[in-house]
Swiss-Prot record:
Statement: the UniProt record of this protein carries the keyword Cytoplasm: yes
Name of the featured protein: Proteasome subunit beta 2
Propiece span(s): 1-17
Species assigned in the record: Saccharolobus solfataricus (strain 98/2)
One cellular component (GO) term of this entry: cytoplasm
Length: 211
């Protein structure tokens, strides 16, 4: 896709400042992200949370404008809870991703500056990647943000759909740490979420425990 003018500026805002990773295997989904927030070349915050949860079995990773991401996170929670109290019952992960894609597509001329991974477990593990235009793809593994070229190289080299959830968690951790070493907008440490049929577990890893 050729990006020009304002679209290039938006793309740069989304790419600069984070690295997130998603991996899908038979037992569940891994979501991982670093903890650094940048304002230009300034490190604005060293302990930002970029892995969030809609339910115990559905999570997201975030990249982009903080204000837009907070709004979109509220939208996602409202979509899930609204469906849960209606006759339709709980919405699927694919349904949530599709609804968000519709929201983003409808506002593409005045877009929310976001890049979202939605992953979780309903009747099976699912992982979706959405950009600010509402484009949606289902993935087995994916990386977003400024460190994504480095992280994606690790994933491409080592991903195996038959790997266990623990092995996938270790791969995601190493992919983000590889980005931390090479990308100045990615840093501090990594949050890794393991989402499976019984819920989720979260692990944290840091370059320096005193940070």
């Amino acid at each position: 896709m050729v990006i020009m003018g304002n679209e290039l500026q938006l793309e740069n805002k989304i790419l600069k400042g984070t690295t997130t990773v998603g991996i899908r295997v038979n037992d569940g989904v891994i979501l991982a992200a670093d903890r650094r927030a940048s304002a230009g070349f300034f490190v604005a915050n060293k302990m930002v949370r970029k892995v969030l949860y809609i339910t115990d079995k559905i999570g997201i990773t975030t990249a982009g404008s903080v204000a837009d991401l907070q709004f979109i996170y509220d939208v996602l929670k409202n979509i899930y809870h609204y469906n849960s109290i209606t006759k339709y019952g709980p919405i699927s992960i694919k349904g949530i991703a599709t609804r968000l894609a519709n929201v983003l597509s409808a506002t593409k001329y005045f877009p929310y500056i976001v890049q979202i991974l939605i992953g979780g477990y309903d009747d099976q593990p699912r992982l979706f990647n959405l950009d600010y235009l509402g484009d949606i793809t289902e993935e087995n593994y994916v990386a977003t943000g400024s460190g994504s070229p480095v992280a994606m190289g690790v994933l491409e080299d080592e991903y195996n759909p038959k790997m266990t959830l623990d092995e996938a968690a270790d791969l995601a951790k190493r992919a983000v740490f590889s980005a931390i070493k090479r990308d100045s907008f990615t840093g501090t440490g990594v949050i890794v979420a393991k989402i499976h049929s019984k819920g989720h577990e979260e692990l944290e890893f840091y370059l320096n425990k005193k940070m």
